[in-house]
Amino acid sequence: MKINLCNIQFQSLINLLNLQATTMSLLNSNKIKADLIPDEDDPKKITLRLNSVPEEHTDDNSSIDLPLTTPKQKDDFMNAIKSFETLNIEPDIVKTEQADAPATSGDNNRKVVDANVDEYTVDGLKLKSKYVAYYKCLKILVDFLVMYVSKEVSMKEYEQVYTLGRQLYEVLRSIFVDEPFKLWLERNTHEFDNNKDKILETLQSELKLALADKDKLKTCTFKDIITNLLNTKLDCKYDCADEYIKPNCIVDTYNCCNLVFKKET
């Protein structure tokens, strides 16, 4: 995911990184670290690579510990990226030479996969090939919603962002296309990139109105507010008139291991 550092508030970026780190940690029970890798061809670009690291392998001082919770952590991170204009966030991808290393006693619940991370859900489930692009678009929507909502309601405490993230990431944990907006996304994935800016602008304006309703915020979860909005603004009305949607499954296989991906995006 690419982020224009000139157009984002620093706290919103911190919220997004902390959310992704927390979600990864919940899924595989490992510590989360991040490596900052400057682009060799463009001095204004830098990549932040998230890594899921077993507890016994967390002594690498060159990596950043996530989540960023202390003032010093946040200041150090801001100083590290302030000279760049574009930040590319890459999810949990382990270098091939690490993946090929002999397994240790602490690696019994790890599985090396000769695949791209985009081919799997956040829970490590294998996506059907026709749903890889669909799921990638769904992640873009969820990441945008997390950043915008946390900024709009002035979330600064880690626990607030964590709660928001847990609610919204339930959207990504679903393995079925069983809501109007998911059916819409399934049928419009091929045009998503061309229409992304317009889609996000529409959602932003509608979210601003929805989040201004203080009474609704007291009685509804963020997940309910946002899924209702998505189902209203992103839907195929002519397909949902009978209020029934066939629950298409988006995954092929299930896994019980922590996955190590050998291919990079």
UniProtKB/Swiss-Prot annotation:
The lineage of its organism: Viruses, Viruses incertae sedis, Naldaviricetes, Lefavirales, Baculoviridae. It holds the Pfam family DUF2704. It comes from Autographa californica nuclear polyhedrosis virus. It comes from the Viruses. This is Uncharacterized 30.6 kDa protein in IAP2-VLF1 intergenic region.
